[in-house]
C-alpha cells in the first residue's frame, strides 16, 4: 500500500467534505455611492448545502467590554439568488439574519449607517464606531460594516473597497490592487479582518521606521487644523522610546495610528480616546484641542494602545483567541490585558526619560485616588470574567487604575526577589516565548505558569490580591523601593476649589454662572470676578450649557502664565479683563524617594 498516496487521498476527501469552509468570503464596500448617509455592502454567499444560513454582525468586540449591537445600524438586508431574485430572510435578533433556502443564495446586500453623527442615541465608544461623510471621510471599523456566516468565520476574507480617487485608505493591511479607486485587502479569517480598521480621507500621513517596525501616522482633521507632519516628531520620539523599553520584544512589522479629529461645530464623535488592535489603533480626539495638549494626550493614549502588542497580541487566553462576537465568554485576566498595559504606558516614560520621577509617582498616586472610589474588595478575576453584567461592569474602569497598580506591585515584588535583576517586563517576555500570538493559554493555568516562572511569593500575591478580595497596601510596596508617602504640591483647576465646582448653570438661559458666595481662587478675584457673574467667553470663545464640555477641556489645558481674557457679565453689563494665569496650588497625598539605602533597587525598578 502506498501510504503517502492513501494519506493524500484521505486529506483530499476531508478537504472536499469541508470544502465550503475553505472558500474565500468576498466582500465589496462601495464608498462612491453614499445615499442617506449609508454605505452599501455586498457579500458573496459561500457555497453550501444548508437550508438555512445565519449571518451576524458583532454584539461585542474585543477591547470595549460593552454590548454595542452593531446590527442596529444595518438596514435593507437582502439575500439574492443567482438570478437576482430575493430569498426569504428572517431577522432572529438585533445582530443576526437567517437566510432561508441558503443553498440557492448567491449574495447578500445591506446598507450601513454610521455612528459618529448620532452619538446622542447610543453608547458606542467613538474609536469603535464609524463615520460616513461622502467624498471626505470614512472611518471604517470593519466590525461595524462586515459580519460573518455561521460556520465560516475561520474562512479567509477578501475585502474590496470602491472609493473616490481623491481618498486614500490608511490601514496596516496591504492593498493588493494598484488602481487609484479600488483597494483589495485579504485576511486569513474574520477575527483578523475586524482587527484591521481603515480610514479613508484625503492623504495626510507620514511613515517612519523604528527598529525594523514600519509606523504609519494618518490624520483626518476636517478643518485642517492638524496635520500628520505636525505630530510626527513627538510620535516618533514616543514610539522609539517604547521600542527601546521593550528591547528585543517584537510582535509586528507594521503599525498604523489612525487619528480622527472631531469637529465640535456639528454632530460628531464625542467619545475621546483610542481602541487597540494588534497592528493598529484608532484614535478620536477633539479638533479644537490645542496642538501641544493634543501631543501630550496622544503620548499617553497611543502608548497604552501600542503596548497591547505585548498583551493580548502575544499573550492571551483561549477566550480571546476564539472570541465569540455575539455570545462571548470573557477572560479572567483584564488585570494583565489592560492593567499591565497601562502600567507599561507610564513606566516606559520614566524609564526612557520622558517624564520625571516625581511625575511618575504623581501618576501612580492619582491611580490610587481613583481606585479608592471603586470596589476594592471585588476580586479582579471575578470582575473580569463577568464584566458584561452588573455590578461588575460598573467596575470596568478600575482596570486602568487598580489594574495598573497591581502590575506595579508585581513589578516591585519581582524586583525585590531578584535583587533588581528582573521585573514584570521580563516576565511578559517569558510568557510571550511560552505562548506567543498563535498559542493561547487556559484561563485557569496562567497563575500557576507565572508562579513557575517567578517565585512562590508571586503566586501568593496573585491568589490573595487578584483572585481574592484583599485590598493592597500600596504604601508597603512603594516602601520596598525606598519611596514613602508625603504631601506634595499640585496645580489645581481654576474652576474647582476644595473638590467643589465654582460654576453652575442657569437652566432658563443656559448661561454659565460663578456660584454666588463661592470661595473663588485669587486669580479669578484679580480678574474682578464675583460670585453670581455670568461667564460669557474666554479668549473670544463664547460658552454656555451647549458647549460646557469644551470649557472644562480648556481649563485642563491652561498653563501657568498663559495670557487669558475673560468676558463676564454683571447686571447685564459685559466686561473684558486680561491677565496671566496663576493656577491654584494645593497639597495632595503623594510619594517621594527617601531611603538612599535602596537607591540601586529603585533605579533598577524605574530605569532597568
Q: Where would I find each of the regions flagged by the language model?
A:
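Bacterial Sec-dependent N-terminal signal peptides
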Residues: 1-26
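Early extracytoplasmic/domain-onset interaction patches
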Residues: 22-60, 141-144
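Intrinsic-disorder/low-complexity, polar/charged segments enriched in Ser/Thr/Lys/Arg/Asp/Glu/Gln
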Residues: 24-26, 38-42, 52-54, 105-107, ...
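Non-catalytic architectural context of zinc metalloproteases
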Residues: 44, 67-76, 80-240, 244-252, ...
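Solvent-exposed coil/turn segments that connect beta secondary-structure elements
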Residues: 60, 102, 113-115, 164, ...
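An active-site-proximal "capping" alpha-helix that borders the catalytic cofactor pocket
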Residues: 77, 242, 336-348
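Juxtacatalytic substrate-recognition/specificity segment
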Residues: 204-333
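C-terminal recognition in membrane/secretory proteostasis and scaffolding
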Residues: 345-346, 354-608
